[in-house]
Amino acid sequence: MTVANFIGLAEGSIENSAREKGAPFYDGLNFHRVEAGAIIQGGCPLGNGLGNPGYKFKNETPKSLNHDKAGVVAMANSGRNTNGSQFYITMRPIPSLDGDYSVFGQVEKGLGVIEMIEIGDKIVSVTIERRGESAKVFNVNEAFPAKARKKL
């Protein structure tokens, strides 16, 4: 669900209360939280860490996905099962976050860019590269149906 949520918001295929239908959610949003040497956080439609997409969903925290290196991408939340649109990227291992946040990605290239991001820097656009046949036919709304999203 977590990956499908991020892809759906990035591509504009998941309905939300912050953007018009079909509009890419993350384009133009800012990074509202930066903890030097630790994490950067973005994805808030209000730009201050208090916004959401109008729904929340459950945590997915398998023990195999950890905050064990720089570049881990995970959902930010305000408590268990309150995931929405906000995400963060780690700049170093932070094992204290394990089990409480849904890890769903890893930055593979450009880790140095993360360290240059400052509060207020904009996300110009998010591009999802669908490589391979299974990625090309992946249906976000089947993987993350509306019933899995609890309206706020």
Where are the predicted features?
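Cyclophilin-like peptidyl-prolyl cis-trans isomerases
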Residues: 1-152
